[in-house]
């Protein structure tokens, strides 16, 4: 340990002081509250001996939807941004290959697929946005949440979604919705609860724990537990910012961000089931073990026919 500390001190002393302008994901979701925000605001300054810091804010605080995030990064408005790959795929369809709706049904396989696709994403981020991709991570499984009006409904096949207005945020999810006869409606995550209240949408697609944290249980009755992906997400730096950093600062990020990425995947694995439990009848606890209210949604498991439809 002493040798490590001795070796690391010169690197810190050689660092140039820098404050980064950073955008995280949504303020009310746990990736920001427990990992993204703390990394930039607490861990980075500590690891760098105060040399590196960040003015880091969530999409929610900045009033951003997430769809525009890479354009702002390219313009140099921000130094680094966290985002969802399918939110930015309208500008670069190849990016969506990391998260095709319904193709992969388990998180382990999904992570391997994203890692395999990483080199393609790295190239696309650099060529399209002048950005350096430094992290890939996921969210709990993307499932359907619907206001069916009657909680006595205990079964609901995908064929019954015909004519329903369903919130989406990507082309691939929109294709799935159209494929089952629904009508895809693109709505930013932060605006979905009022959209469901007003009938602009009948159902929405999002992750299990994000749905709970965003209080979707206040406006929907059912959780249709068909997995349509895990919302592949990223951290990217503006390439000019990255290249302007001294080698000691770059080395710190390249050493520490893989650790943060691993924490993201571990949390996602835990939060998938936790979200389903919290949205339904429990048990429901936060990450520290404190009791939380349950959402009271009726869970509906996919039928064999529904599972087969995903493979078509």
Language model: regions and residue ranges:
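N-terminal secretory/targeting leader peptides
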Residues: 2, 6-109, 127, 132-312
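Hinge/lid segment of periplasmic solute-binding proteins
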Residues: 112-130
